[in-house]
């Protein structure tokens, strides 16, 4: 748990 979570995905899109 905690790999491609919505929160992490948002950070990826932030770039």
Curated annotation (Swiss-Prot):
Keyword Secreted: no
Keywords assigned by UniProt, alphabetized: Allergen, Muscle protein
Superkingdom, taxonomy of origin: Eukaryota
Its biological purpose: Troponin I is the inhibitory subunit of troponin, the thin filament regulatory complex which confers calcium-sensitivity to striated muscle actomyosin ATPase activity.
Family the entry assigns: Belongs to the troponin I family.
Protein name in UniProt: Troponin I
């Amino acid at each position: 748990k905690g790999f491609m979570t919505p929160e992490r995905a948002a950070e990826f899109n932030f770039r």
